[in-house]
From Swiss-Prot:
InterPro entries on file: aa-tRNA-synth_I_CS, aa-tRNA-synth_Ic, Rossmann-like_a/b/a_fold, Trp-tRNA-ligase, Trp-tRNA-ligase_bac-type, Trp-tRNA_synthetase
Impact reported for L91F: In TRPS10330; reduced activity
UniProtKB keywords: Aminoacyl-tRNA synthetase, ATP-binding, Cytoplasm, Ligase, Nucleotide-binding, Protein biosynthesis
Location (main, coarse): cytoplasm
GO cellular component terms attached to this protein's record: cytosol
Gene3D superfamilies noted in UniProt: HUPs (3.40.50.620), Tyrosyl-Transfer RNA Synthetase (1.10.240.10)
Organism listed in the record: Escherichia coli (strain K12)
EC number: 6.1.1.2
Location of the protein in the cell: Cytoplasm
Name by which UniProt lists this protein: Tryptophan--tRNA ligase
Length: 334
């Protein structure tokens, strides 16, 4: 039986965090045996905000090495860089003509980003969700692992696919969201009611996957908990957001359930919890970084992974693009 196709991607425009790892990358790794996984480094999305060219090139290779270090296996999955597969931009343009201005105007991420990058509100930033739809629909994707912040974009992808299919027949699979049961959201260390973000200006809120583990220990020990007396280590997102966040992180790293951890820390101080979280996270990062540096220092291997991945992706993408071009009436290239 053919495995369902999963597509997902991440920008190379900033260092990945443990939030990215626990909320996305680890799920990607776990899906490799049961699904046909296609994972993309979306460098074309990254340039919707200004990038330094040298830094972008470095960040792309860094991100690829991190994917591999986290356990994404090029023998099991297709891993590639978006700009290496021109069908993404080609389908993106075609889908622009089947997407309405009003739909894009309602995208909350555009509103947020245009406020943050007021000096550079470019058409690419506005049009970002259409390229994302092309990314997904090119591969006849069945499932897309999405966080809450991308659900609206996936809904638009589904709408575009259904609109196109209604006009031309079943050209696209209509993708479904895949939302993991747990580990999907790691919150900010000092503001635990908001999601941890690699673009956060306050670096004390964020744990980067490539950060010095000693620095991470200090950050975790400064993390917000609670002011109750005596302290109670209990999972309660509404009333104990900081404590709950630390329990979520510890559970994700160790594999222990939340009830097991609550029992383990019964009668203990918040300092005990922070110490355990710090030890677990720093240990995990030390091992991950050793693997990362091994891959990052072998640039010939990274180049081969990108080349092989782009060839596999393009073989799949070109079939979809050919069907789209034929449906809309383009003359086939001689």
């Amino acid at each position: 039986m053919t495995k369902p196709i999963v597509f997902s991607g991440a920008q190379p425009s900033g260092e990945l965090t443990i939030g990215n790892y626990m909320g996305a990358l680890r799920q990607w790794v776990n899906m490799q045996d049961d699904y046909h996984c296609i994972y993309c480094i979306v460098d074309q999305h990254a340039i919707t905000v200004r990038q330094d060219a040298q830094k972008l090139r470095k960040a792309t290779l860094d991100t690829l090495a991190l994917y591999l270090a986290c356990g994404i296996d090029p023998e099991k999955s297709t891993i590639f860089v978006q700009s290496h597969v021109p069908e993404h931009a080609q389908l993106g343009w075609a889908l622009n003509c089947y997407t309405y201005f009003g739909e894009l105007s309602r995208m909350t991420q555009f509103k947020d980003k245009s406020a943050r990058y007021a000096e550079n509100i470019n058409a690419g930033l506005f049009d970002y969700p259409v390229l994302m739809a092309a990314d997904i629909l090119l591969y006849q994707t069945n499932l897309v692992p999405v966080g809450e912040d991308q659900k609206q974009h996936l809904e638009l992808s589904r709408d575009i696919a259904q609109r196109f299919n209604a006009l031309y027949g079943e050209i696209f699979k209509v993708p479904e969201p895949f939302i993991p049961k747990s580990g999907a959201r790691v919150m900010s260390l000092l503001e635990p009611t908001k999601k941890m973000s690699k673009s956060d200006d306050n670096r004390n809120n964020v744990i980067g996957l490539l950060e010095d583990p000693k620095s991470v220990v200090k950050k975790i020990k400064r993390a917000v908990t609670d002011s109750d007396e005596p302290p109670v280590v209990r999972y309660d997102v509404q009333n104990k957001a900081g404590v709950s966040n630390l329990l979520d992180i510890l559970s994700a790293v160790t594999g222990q359930s939340i009830p097991e951890l609550e029992k383990q820390f019964e009668g203990k101080m918040y300092g005990h919890l922070k110490g355990e979280v710090a030890d677990a996270v720093s240990g995990m990062l030390t091992e991950l970084q050793e693997r990362y540096h091994r891959f990052r220092n072998d640039e010939a291997f990274l180049q081969q992974v990108m080349k092989d991945g782009a060839e596999k992706a393009s073989a799949h993408a070109s079939r979809t693009l050919k069907a789209v071009y034929e449906a809309i009436g383009f003359v086939a290239k001689p």
